Design a protein with these regions (language model features):
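N-terminal presequence-like segments and adjacent domain-start helices
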Residues: 1-12, 17
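Short beta-strands and strand-coil junctions in structured, solvent-facing domains, enriched
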Residues: 3, 60-63, 81, 98-100
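Generic non-transmembrane alpha-helical segments
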Residues: 15, 19-23, 73, 77
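Short edge beta-strands and adjacent turn/loop segments
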Residues: 23-56, 93-95
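A short interface-forming secondary-structure element
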Residues: 51-68
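Short, non-transmembrane amphipathic alpha-helical segments
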Residues: 63-82
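Short, highly charged C-terminal tails/helix-capping segments
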Residues: 88-100
Length: 100
């Protein structure tokens, strides 16, 4: 069957945000930017997806552990929900708050 599926950047950003909300140690997601073609045909994958995520983390957590987990889980959730692969998921920790 021929056809095309287009997935909006808002969908990718929502999947990323929902995933991040489930990770312990992340205080809040400040900004998510996506770029690339969010397009897939039934017969071949033509996406070129890049995601930039800006986070605030809580003290007492290892930043490398949290961010690596976030990258893996976001990639997995995007792949399972949309069939798309991200070329890059860049995470920037731009603030830290005391754990409450």
């Amino acid at each position: 069957m021929q056809g095309e599926i287009q997935i909006s950047k808002a969908v990718i950003e929502s999947i990323s945000k929902i995933t991040l909300d489930e990770i312990e140690g992340i205080y809040k997601t400040n900004k998510i930017k996506t770029s690339g073609k969010l397009f897939s045909s039934v017969s071949e994958d033509l996406n070129d997806l890049n995601i930039d995520i800006f986070l605030t983390v809580k003290t007492g957590y290892k930043i490398k552990t949290i961010t690596t987990l976030a990258q893996k889980q976001i990639l997995s959730n995007i792949k399972s929900m949309t069939g798309l692969d991200a070329d890059s998921i860049n995470i920037y920790v731009d603030d830290i708050v005391e754990k409450q």
